[in-house]
C-alpha cells in the first residue's frame, strides 16, 4: 500500500504517505492496492479511447463511465474491494473493446500503430490474488527509485487534480451534461500520465491544462444544476431537528435528493440534508418540497457521532464516507453510485423504497428543537444580482475587502484558524464561503453592511465557479486585473476536488491564495517553493498576522 492523496495522510520525519495495513481514512491496504490497479487500467482505457478518436471512433458509454470509475478512488468514496474489482474488470473489458476497434480501423486504413505504451498492452490478471500481487508494479509512486522526487510529486499533482475533475465530470453527467471535447481531453491527459512522464516543465503545463479543463467542467455542472433545479435563491434553513420520521441525505448529488423528495411525498417522512448537500435548500425545484425540513449535522469528519444519533435512514450519494460500524448505524446506511462500504446496502437506479421502509421502521425525532436558521443560496445568479449593490458599497467605502474562506473541512486542530479568521475579519469586510469548510463558522452571527449580509454562502465546492464569476464582474466594473481587487482567497484543502479547484484558480491567473492547514504531502519542499514563487501561494500562519498583511497590501 502507498497512498498520499489526502491531507490527513501520514506525515512524519521518517514517513510520508500511508503505507501500512490501513490508511488514515480507514481503507485497507487491499482496497488501496486494488484502486492502484483500477487507475492503471483506466489509463489504458484512456490510451485506446484517445487512439480511437484518431479513427473517428467515439464510445459515449465508455467516455461517461471512465471518469465515474476514476471518481471511485477519490478519498472517502469506496472502501469495498468487491466493487473495486468489478470496476477494474469492466475497465479491462472496455480497454479490450477499444483496442480491438482501433486495431481493426488501423488495418482497414493501412495505418501503422507505433509506440504503444505498456499501460495500453497490460493484461489484467485473472484473480483477485494475482491482481493484488501485481499491484506494487503500478503503485502511484512507481519509478520513485529511478526519477527525482519532484517528478513523482508533479505526476501526483496531475493525477489527483485530474481525479478531482473526473468527480465533477460525473456530477455533471448525472444532470445530463456531457461534452465529447472534454472527454477527449480527459483521456489524452489520463493516457499521458500512464506513460510515467518525467519532464518537469511538461508536468507543470499539464497541471494548468487540468485546471482550465476543470473550469469548463464546473461551468457544465453549474449549467446542469441551474437548468434542472433553477437558480439558487437566498433561503433560510433550519439546522435543528423536527419531530417525525426522517431521512438524511449526504454527499453532493442533488438528483438523488430530488428523487427521495418525490418518493417521500405524503408519507410522513421529513428529509434533511447533511454536509455538502446544505446548499440544496436554495434551489427552487428542491425547496418547494415542504418536507425538506432542514439540515442536520455538520462536516464529514463528524458523521460517526452525528449519524449514530440520527434516528432514521441515511443515504450517502458521494464522498465523504467514514466507517459506519464505529457508530453502529451501518444497517441504516445506504450507498449510491460510486460509494461503497462492505456489507452496507447499495442502491442502483432511482428506487429508494428500501430507504423509505428503513426510515418508517426507525423512531424518528421525538420532539421539535428550538429552531436555528442560517442562510444559503448566494450562488452565481444571486451574486450577480447583488453585484450592483455590492459595487455601490465598495465605492462608498463601506466594503473595504472581500474574503473567500472555504474548502474542505477535516479533523486537525489547526483548522480552527478558519473560525478565528472569520471572527476577526473587520466589520467592513465581506466573507464568501463554500464547501464543507463553512461549518467551522456558518452558524455564527456576522451581521450585514447596509443590508448586504457579511457572510454569503456560495454553495458546494464546485460553486467556486460562482465566486469566480463575481470576481470577474468586479474586475470588469473597476477596470482592473482580478489580482488587483481587494479580494483574498483563504482556502482549506482535504482531498482531490480541492486540489483541482486550486489548479483551476492558478490556471486562471489568480495569485496570493492562502492555503492550509498543511501542504500536500506529495509535494516536495522544492515543488512548494516553485508554486509559491510562480503563483504567490501562501501558507496560513497566525490569524492576526495574516489579516494585517492582507489588509495592508
UniProtKB/Swiss-Prot annotation:
Coiled-coil parts of chain: none
Enzyme class, first EC level, given as a word: oxidoreductase
Reactions performed catalytically: A + NH4(+) + H2O = hydroxylamine + AH2 + H(+)
Cofactor: [2Fe-2S] cluster; hybrid [4Fe-2O-2S] cluster
Positions annotated to bind hybrid [4Fe-2O-2S] cluster: 252, 276, 320, 408, 436, 461, 495, 497
UniProt subcellular location: Cytoplasm
Gene Ontology biological process: response to hydrogen peroxide
Domain of life: Bacteria
CDD domains named among the record's database cross-references: HCP
Cellular component aspect of the GO annotation: cytoplasm
Annotated disulfide bonds: none
UniProt keywords, alphabetically: 2Fe-2S, Cytoplasm, Iron, Iron-sulfur, Metal-binding, Oxidoreductase
GO molecular function: 2 iron, 2 sulfur cluster binding; hydroxylamine reductase activity; metal ion binding; peroxidase activity
Broad class of where this protein is predominantly found: cytoplasm
Binding, [2Fe-2S] cluster: 3, 6, 18, 25
Modified residues (Cysteine persulfide): 408
Note accompanying the cofactor annotation: Binds 1 [2Fe-2S] cluster.
UniProt-listed Enzyme Commission number(s): 1.7.99.1
Functional summary from the UniProt entry: Catalyzes the reduction of hydroxylamine to form NH(3) and H(2)O.
Protein family per UniProt: Belongs to the HCP family.
This protein's name: Hydroxylamine reductase
